[in-house]
């Protein structure tokens, strides 16, 4: 958690050195949790300070002069999301077929051979999590999802994602896979719960890691236990997460 917070704050501060409102350089304050657009150019003020302590660090604020004053900026008039770290909501979902005995998994070209995971994507402005799940699943796989249940969340600071895990269930007439809507996935398949349980036992690993010693060539591979994708897959195929909620 400490690493994730630090990673996200460092990345955000490095990417946002200028004010999005007026374009002037900003200052990192509050331990990196905020960037502020000051009313005067502190760099030029510091260079003209005759004391041993610069004006930027002085306890007595100096009024802006004509030489150091900056143009008016809306971010100084109140709380504004222009000055705070961004967090991008991202949906990641295990999709179960209507019969409740298969799970949809996909893979991109960068994945190792036989390595599959849950589908995922960014939520769009003014979109609910449930709507984002249905849209992303349809765009990437052509599957139509009805019921959506939010499962859990995981921060993912690469650079600023909040992974919102969900479980969706397809409608009977919308279970044919079609990758033609979006070229993001190389492949998507329906896997039986039995096959996925076996992969959870012997075939979990990170993308750049070797599969477990009991994994056999050609078998399904899945994300590691530390990933939210693994957690929602496990909840579905091993812990009966879907069966406890009535189907739509």
Which residues are covered by each model-predicted region?
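Short loop/turn microsegments at loop-to-beta-strand junctions
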Residues: 90-91, 129, 186
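Conserved aromatic-histidine-acidic binding/catalytic patches
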Residues: 7-10, 81, 121, 125
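N-terminal strand-loop-strand
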Residues: 28-31, 35, 41-117, 144-145, ...
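Short cysteine-rich clusters marking metal-coordination/redox-active sites
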Residues: 19-22, 37
């Amino acid at each position: 958690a400490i690493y994730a917070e630090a990673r996200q704050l460092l990345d955000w501060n490095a990417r946002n050195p200028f004010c999005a409102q007026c374009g002037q350089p900003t200052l990192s304050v509050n331990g990196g949790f905020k960037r502020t657009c000051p009313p005067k150019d502190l760099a030029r003020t510091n260079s003209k300070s005759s004391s041993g302590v610069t004006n930027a660090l002085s306890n007595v604020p100096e009024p802006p002069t004509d030489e150091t004053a900056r143009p008016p900026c809306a971010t100084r008039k109140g709380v504004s999301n222009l000055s705070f770290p961004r967090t991008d909501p991202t949906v990641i979902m295990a999709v179960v077929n209507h019969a409740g005995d298969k799970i949809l998994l996909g893979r991109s070209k960068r994945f190792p051979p036989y390595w599959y995971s849950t589908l995922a994507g960014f939520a769009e402005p003014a979109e609910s999590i449930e709507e984002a799940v249905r849209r992303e699943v349809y765009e990437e796989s052509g599957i139509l999802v009805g019921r959506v249940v939010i499962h859990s969340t995981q921060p993912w600071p690469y650079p600023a994602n909040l992974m919102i895990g969900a479980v969706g269930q397809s409608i009977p007439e919308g279970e044919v896979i079609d990758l033609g809507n979006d070229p993001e996935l190389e492949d998507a398949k329906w896997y039986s719960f039995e096959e996925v349980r076996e992969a959870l036992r012997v075939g979990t690993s990170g993308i750049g890691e070797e599969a477990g010693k009991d994994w056999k060539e050609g078998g399904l591979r899945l994300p590691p236990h530390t990933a939210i994708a693994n957690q929602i897959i496990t909840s579905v195929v091993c812990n009966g997460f879907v069966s406890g909620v009535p189907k739509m």
